[in-house]
Amino acid sequence: MGRRIQGQRRGRGTSTFRAPSHRYKAELSHKRTEDTDVLAGEVIDVEHDPARSAPVARVAFEDDDQRLVLASEGVGVGDTIEIGISATIEEGNTLPLAEIPEGVPVCNVESHPGDGGKFARAGGVNADLVTHERDATIVELPSGETKRLSPDCRATIGVVAGGGRTEKPFVKAGNKHHKMKARGTKWPRVRGVAMNAVDHPFGGGGRQHPGRPKSVSRDAAPGRKVGDIASKRTGRGGNE
């Protein structure tokens, strides 16, 4: 009898397949303020968060509240950032889209007013504020997609810190291992045809090939459910 395939092991939910969320710092969201207020805070530290690709800044606000915020490029220890409708247009400050001029790069953009920020949060990325309309603000996301958002949605001025992260090579497999482990991703990913016959339905043989049709029923047993699951068609094929 063969061993359990990786999909069956993943379903059991051991630590190998779970993200170490107990090490994550916090869910970063915009601080809530009154509409007429401008709240200032001093950056007292810049920290690493295993949950994300960008550094986070620990900010002590005037109301004696300390929280972690997504760090923008150019923001460092000792700098002051502002949150509010009347905040100045400077890197690291957070204010509604309606108060931000066109063409200014922004990050951590809210999808709906008050949700804390959903778009442009990865290291080194930013969204661009394209134009203002009467009842909407057009924002171009890092993917190139444009979004019509409420003018009351808040965003942070600038580019998320940590740019150039992907340009540095891992060099060693150990470095890649630690990176993937921090995200709960099983790595390395071994191909089924490279396994032994006992480990995978496509394993074994004198050369690497599935050895059977890859199409499999939707109702197949868990240990057999690999390949093209319930495929309507396979192969290259053209439009008919």
Curated annotation (Swiss-Prot):
Annotated region Disordered: where?
A: 199-240
| Signal sequence coordinates | none
Superkingdom, taxonomy of origin: Archaea
Q: Which UniProt keywords apply?
A: Ribonucleoprotein, Ribosomal protein, RNA-binding, rRNA-binding
PROSITE patterns reported for this sequence: RIBOSOMAL_L2
Which InterPro entries does this entry report, sorted A to Z? NA-bd_OB-fold (IPR012340), Rib_uL2_dom2 (IPR014722), Ribosomal_uL2 (IPR002171), Ribosomal_uL2_arc_euk (IPR023672), Ribosomal_uL2_C (IPR022669), Ribosomal_uL2_CS (IPR022671), Ribosomal_uL2_dom3 (IPR014726), Ribosomal_uL2_RNA-bd_dom (IPR022666)
- Enumerate composition-biased segments (Basic and acidic residues): 221-231
The answer, when asked if Ribonucleoprotein is one of the entry's keywords, is yes
Query: What molecular functions are annotated in GO for this chain?
Result: RNA binding; rRNA binding; structural constituent of ribosome
What does the entry give for GO biological process?
Answer: cytoplasmic translation
Annotated Gene Ontology cellular component terms: cytosolic large ribosomal subunit
Q: What does this protein do?
A: One of the primary rRNA binding proteins. Required for association of the 30S and 50S subunits to form the 70S ribosome, for tRNA binding and peptide bond formation. It has been suggested to have peptidyltransferase activity; this is somewhat controversial. Makes several contacts with the 16S rRNA in the 70S ribosome.
**What does the annotation say about its assembly with partners?**
Part of the 50S ribosomal subunit. Forms a bridge to the 30S subunit in the 70S ribosome.
> What's this protein's family per the entry?
Belongs to the universal ribosomal protein uL2 family.
Q: Could you identify this protein by its name?
A: Large ribosomal subunit protein uL2
